[in-house]
């Protein structure tokens, strides 16, 4: 059996940064939980972080990321790069099956176990199985509306939850 993913979306607009996720945990073809919290604030409330993938793996990565963030004096880019380097080279970490989406007031990054640290071109980023749908909806709303970051993030993940069977409509929202 395989753990299935989720959807986490981050939207930036004006001075607002919003991260939202669904709450579904799926194992094989069974929904185990519908209200999991997959986004949280860290770094004294200055960073938003969300995960897709194995919960235990993501918790380990959250802890390591927060340690790197503190080690590098609140430098989000340096913390993300250093975590990605460790993740790629450490034998134990390499086996972790998760992705992180992290953001502060200045940057948004997707961090993967293959050593990737990706800064999205637009003001929206997403990870997980519903990402393509959320990104498409979010980009359209960013381009053609004056909605707030929170409204765009919420609508983007709602649309993803209507299409992706591994994404439900029980959302957790964090905002900077």
UniProtKB/Swiss-Prot annotation:
It catalyses: ATP-dependent cleavage of peptide bonds with broad specificity. The active site is at residue 6. GO terms for biological process: proteolysis involved in protein catabolic process. Keywords: Allosteric enzyme, Cytoplasm, Hydrolase, Metal-binding, Protease, Sodium, Stress response, Threonine protease. It is found in: Cytoplasm. PROSITE patterns: PROTEASOME_BETA_2. Its EC number is 3.4.25.2. Allosterically activated by HslU binding. Belongs to the peptidase T1B family. HslV subfamily. NCBIfam families: ATP_dep_HslV, PRK05456.1. Protease subunit of a proteasome-like degradation complex believed to be a general protein degrading machinery. This is ATP-dependent protease subunit HslV. It comes from Thermosipho africanus (strain TCF52B).
């Amino acid at each position: 059996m395989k753990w299935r993913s989720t959807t986490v979306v981050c939207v930036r607009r004006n001075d607002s940064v919003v991260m939202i996720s669904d709450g579904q945990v799926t194992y094989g073809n069974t929904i185990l939980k519908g209200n999991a919290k997959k986004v949280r604030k860290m770094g004294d409330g200055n960073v938003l972080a969300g995960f897709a993938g194995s919960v235990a793996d993501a918790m380990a990565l959250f802890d390591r990321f927060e340690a790197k963030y503190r080690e590098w004096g609140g430098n989000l880019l340096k913390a993300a790069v250093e975590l990605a380097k460790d993740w790629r080279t450490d034998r134990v970490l390499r086996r972790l099956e998760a992705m992180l989406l992290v953001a502060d007031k200045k940057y948004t990054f997707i961090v993967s176990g293959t050593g990737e640290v990706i800064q999205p071109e637009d003001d929206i980023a997403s990870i997980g199985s519903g990402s393509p749908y959320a990104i498409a909806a979010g980009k359209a709303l960013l381009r053609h509306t004056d909605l707030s970051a929170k409204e765009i993030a919420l609508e983007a993940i709602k649309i993803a939850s209507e299409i992706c069977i591994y994404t439900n409509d029980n959302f957790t929202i964090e905002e900077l």
